[in-house]
Every structure is written in structure tokens, then in C-alpha cells.
Design a protein with these regions (language model features):
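Double-stranded beta-helix
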Residues: 8, 156-215
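Short acidic/polar capping segments at secondary-structure boundaries
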Residues: 116-122, 132, 153-158, 169-172
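Short edge-strand/loop segments of extracellular domains
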Residues: 118-119, 166-173, 229-235
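Active-site glycine-rich loop that binds ribose-phosphate moieties when present
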Residues: 129-137, 151, 181, 185-189
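Non-heme Fe(II)/2-oxoglutarate
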Residues: 2-12, 61, 203, 210-278
Length: 278
């Protein structure tokens, strides 16, 4: 489902009551929601240019981030954690946070700021979920405890490798994280997957347990996508997210705790990777 966010909602920095209910219901039932055109395009353009340069650095390094621990052509690649590339409408978007706080409650925190790049010629990932269930063997499973906030830089079409999503699978609490072909084919007969196509400025929010996979990028463009992960406040916290001093202002109005530390000196953000809430 996609919600067309109005100019009035953008001005008020929150969704209307009806749109908020649709967003929350969609995440509970389908496992995801797309919020339309809530990130300014000029910020995405600046990030896209920098992240494309960084992609070439990763590829030329012959790092396993290029060959991929999962699939060739899908890079683990974070956005630069320093000014002028940190924007409040990305790291603390008020519309996104309105959804996250309503869904997860006050005290929700961010445990991840990184991303991935789907490069031209990539192959299909294995079907997977980003986290398991807190309590196993519940069907339907427990309510959402964490969401991934995906922010692409460009229009993401099927040709450009739009993510494959399996609606409703976040509730299958009696299925382990190891999703083999038999599990996949059984679910396909019940409800087939959809493609999470988005327009520039859209944001995709999905339950971390939702089955999904990266698809082949058949275009000649890199598809960069930033990822944050918002957690319910009572979960244990990992290490703070590292940013470089000079961008603190971007977080001043954040309703979701940024769980951030601001370093005096830059660090090797392309190769010093930390997983979600680690």
C-alpha cells in the first residue's frame, strides 16, 4: 500500500488521522507501507552523487562488500555520516517518526544508519528476513517491534531492482529464519510476492521480519538506498550510531531517539560496518 502524503501533512509534520491509521494497519497486516514524496529531491540528489562515487571506491577495493556475503552486485554501503550529507528529513523525518512512534510507542530508538546499493548486473538474493521473532512458534506472531526505514535516492522500478516483498509473512511466527525453497514455494501458492516500486522522495517502512529479497538490477544505474532501523524502546540497545561532529543540528527535533554519538574525527564508514543494533 502507498499513501499519498499531502502538502498540508508535510507542513504540519504529521499524517492526518485517517492516513496514520492506514499506515499502522498496513504495517500490522501487510508488513509494510510506502509514504509518498516526503523527502526533498535536492537532498537525495546530493547523496546520490556522493554514494555513487563511494560505490566505485568499494568495487575497486575488491572487498567482499562488492562480491557480497549474500549475492553479487548488492553492496553493503552506508551514507556518509557527516555534513553536508546529513539531513533532518532523512535521519529524523517527522512523517516517518510519526508512524514509528505511533507503532512502537514513546521511547523508540534508532539502531542503524547504513544502507545498500544494487549495482547494474546484480543477481537475485535468497529470500530472507532481517530479524527473527522475539517469541517463536506464535502464529500469528507478536506485534511489530522493529521497522526498517528504506529511503531510495531515485525512482525504483522493477528494471532497477525494486525489492521483492512477501505481504503478511511477518506474522508467520512458526517459520524459522532459514527460508528454503520448499517454504518459499508453499507461501507463493498462498500469496505471491509483490515488488516494492517507489518514486523519488518516497519512503518504504517495513517490519524487519517481513520476507523479502533484493532483485536483479537490469538498468545501467546504481540504486542506492539508505536504511534506518527503529526499535521499540524496551529492547536492549547496541552501540550508539556514529556520526562526525558538525551535524548534530539535524537531530534536534527527532521524536525517535537517534541513539547517536558524534566523533571528533572521521572514520572509515565504507568498510567499518556495524550491523543493526550491534
Amino acid at each position: 500500500m502507498k499513501i499519498k502524503v499531502s502538502s498540508e501533512e508535510l507542513t504540519k509534520r504529521e499524517l492526518s488521522a485517517s492516513h496514520l491509521k492506514k499506515a499502522i494497519d498496513a504495517i500490522h497486516e501487510e508488513g509494510y507501507i510506502i509514504l509518498g514524496n516526503i523527502v526533498p529531491h535536492n537532498h537525495l540528489d546530493l547523496l546520490n552523487e556522493k554514494m555513487t562515487q563511494d560505490s566505485h571506491t568499494i568495487v575497486s577495493s575488491n572487498s567482499d562488500r562488492w562480491e557480497g556475503r549474500r549475492t553479487i552486485g548488492h553492496l553493503q554501503q552506508g551514507a556518509p555520516p557527516f555534513a553536508p550529507y546529513i539531513f533532518p528529513d532523512i535521519v529524523a523525518n517527522p512523517i516517518v517518526e510519526h508512524v514509528s512512534i505511533t507503532l512502537l510507542g514513546e521511547g523508540a530508538f534508532n539502531g542503524f544508519y547504513n544502507g545498500n546499493t544494487n549495482t547494474p548486473g546484480s543477481t537475485q538474493q535468497n529470500l530472507h528476513m532481517d530479524t527473527g521473532h522475539l517469541w517463536s512458534n506464535l502464529n500469528p506472531s507478536h506485534p511489530t517491534a522493529s521497522v526498517v526505514v528504506n529511503i531510495p535516492m531515485i525512482d525504483v522500478t522493477e528494471e532497477r531492482g525494486a525489492i521483492e516483498l512477501w505481504p503478511g509473512t511477518h506474522l508467520a511466527g512458526d517459520v524459522s529464519r532459514r527460508l528454503d525453497e520448499a517454504i518459499e514455494e508453499a507461501q507463493r501458492k498462498v500469496r505471491p510476492p509483490v515488488r516494492g516500486t517507489t518514486k523519488k522522495g518516497d519512503v518504504l517502512i517495513r517490519d524487519m521480519r517481513l520476507w523479502h529479497r533484493g532483485a536483479p538490477n537490469l538498468s545501467d544505474m546504481h540504486r542506492h538506498m539508505i536504511a534506518l532501523v527503529h526499535y521499540v524502546g524496551w529492547l536492549c540497545r547496541g552501540r550508539p550510531i556514529r556520526y562526525v561532529k558538525g551535524c548534530e543540528e539535524a537531530f534536534k527535533n527527532s521524536r525517535v531517539d537517534p541513539h547517536a554519538t558524534f566523533l571528533d574525527e572521521p572514520y572509515d564508514y565504507l568498510f567499518d560496518y556495524r550491523g543493526p543494533n550491534s
